[in-house]
Design a protein with these regions (language model features):
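Hydrophobic anchor at the beta1->P-loop junction of P-loop NTPases
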Residues: 7
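Pre-Walker A (Motif I) flank of P-loop NTPase domains
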Residues: 1-4
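Conserved lysine of the Walker
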Residues: 15
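Hydrophobic positions on the alpha1 helix immediately C-terminal to the Walker A/P-loop
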Residues: 18
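ATP-dependent small-molecule kinase phosphotransfer cores
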Residues: 31-123, 197
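Walker A (P-loop) phosphate-binding loop of P-loop NTPases
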Residues: 12
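A glycine- and Lys/Arg-enriched "phosphate-lid" helix/loop adjacent to the NTP-binding pocket
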Residues: 100-169
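NTP-dependent small-molecule kinase module
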Residues: 23, 139-210
Length: 210
């Protein structure tokens, strides 16, 4: 079994940059690295992503949202993640099931026990070996997004500040409940400093796998 690393955190925390840097470094070390994101990562998942994040879908119910996220996740796990991990590779994923607990659980206030049951069904019990939470104040993260070049904000990014604050608190609560799996990092640090800490932790996880 390979190593499964997920990145979590509020919007604008720099996850995508850190995913790219980590994957490139691991590849240079000789590891077979797969990078992916949620929702998406498969043809079906990417189609679901378009529906989920379309700003025009303002009428989407929280229950619809969680089932769509879980459908995309089930496809990603079965089609992409499990085969790569079974072959001994490293998966670096930009968001995974913990985002469901933070955004749909804490953010939308859906029942966490129901979300856990749906998630277990969708993932077959697959859990990351290491989850890196890039944390920063919500206003700062959204400010980064606004000042970036990523184009129009998606449906989730357009939610009220209070929603994003609840989601952030959710990430921190999840991390506190599983300190062995989670590492919370200050995402206001320089990119290079963050990456150095991430690499040290990932190397330790790889050593434990051997």
């Amino acid at each position: 079994m390979g190593l499964f690393v997920s990145f979590e955190g509020p919007e604008g925390s720099g996850k995508t940059t850190q995913v790219r840097l980590l994957a490139s470094w691991l590849s240079e070390l000789g590891w077979r690295v797969l990078t992916t994101r949620e929702p998406g990562g498969t043809r079906i998942g990417d189609a679901v992503r378009e529906v989920l994040l379309d700003p025009a879908h303002t009428e989407m119910r929280p229950e619809t949202e969680i089932l769509l996220f879980s459908a995309a996740r089930a496809q990603l796990v079965a089609q992409v993640l499990v085969p790569h991990l079974d072959a001994g590779g490293v998966v670096v994923c930009d968001r995974f099931a913990d985002s469901t607990f933070a955004y749909q659980g804490y953010g939308r206030r859906l029942d966490l026990d129901i979300l856990r049951a749906i998630t277990a069904f969708a993932t077959g019990g697959l859990v990351p070996d290491l989850t890196l939470c890039l944390d920063l104040p919500v206003v700062e993260g959204l400010g980064r997004k606004q000042g970036g070049d990523q184009g129009e904000w998606n449906r989730m990014e357009r939610e009220q500040i209070e929603f994003h604050e609840r989601a952030r608190r959710g990430f921190l609560s999840l991390a506190a409940a599983e300190p062995a799996r989670w590492l919370v990092l200050d995402a206001t640090q320089p990119v290079e400093e963050l990456q150095a800490v991430i690499r040290r932790r990932v190397l330790a996880c790889l050593d434990n796998k051997m």
